[in-house]
A protein has these predicted regions:
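Alpha-helical transmembrane segments and their immediate juxtamembrane cytosolic regions
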Residues: 1-199
């Protein structure tokens, strides 16, 4: 997709999601690190609960419009690992409690989703939608399942005492990402926006 053919509504929605994430983390930092007793507006709870899913769906939609998904996924996942390293360092240095560590956040998730996209991108749209729904349902069914193994948390299986200040497990979120790619295939099949709708 050429730079001049960017889909404005997707850029606007992603920008809004990023702005909301920044505000969410700012409020969290003011409460957690500075100790301010702040009133949490209604939109805070909404964004905290649903903003991540919306952003993942949008990212899946955008995956159908670009290229080099695997390479970009590696970069995004590396950024997620850097955040894990920094937050773990903050804990080890006594700057914050263990709860601040990001073990598998949104950047880890998006990186994995982007790297996996070339594997399933050739699936028929209906099959992709079915797999996406199945992963979403499975993810919510296993949500909060406690297991003894400590290496399954990226898939949503947590161990006793597990905490992560930002947690986006592969299940159900890979399913939401796939449904986003279905949205991209259907709504933006020609990889451009309908400019007449905003004139």
């Amino acid at each position: 997709m050429k730079k001049t053919d960017r889909i404005w509504e997707l850029d606007a929605l992603r920008g809004l999601c990023i702005l909301c994430v920044i505000l969410i983390h700012l409020i969290f930092d003011l409460i957690y690190f500075i100790g301010l007793d702040l009133y949490l507006p209604a939109w805070y709870v909404f964004v905290q609960q649903y903003g991540g899913v919306i952003f993942v769906v949008l990212s899946g939609c955008c995956a159908t419009l670009g290229s080099r998904s695997f390479r970009r996924g590696c970069i995004v996942f590396s950024c997620g690992m850097l955040i894990s390293l920094v937050t773990f360092g903050m804990y080890r240095l006594g700057m914050a409690s263990r709860d601040v560590i990001v073990w598998f956040g949104v950047l880890h998730l998006l990186g994995v989703c982007m790297m996996l996209y070339p594997v399933y991108k050739k699936l028929p749209t209906q099959a992709l939608a079915a797999v996406g729904v199945a992963l979403v349902v499975t993810g919510y069914l296993i949500s909060g399942t406690v297991v003894e193994a400590k290496f399954l948390f990226p898939f949503g299986f947590v161990y006793e005492g597990f905490t992560s200040s930002d947690f986006f497990p592969i299940l159900p979120h890979l399913g939401w990402y796939m449904l986003g790619t279905v949205l991209g295939r259907t709504v933006y099949a020609d990889k451009k926006t309908d400019r007449k709708s905003v004139v």
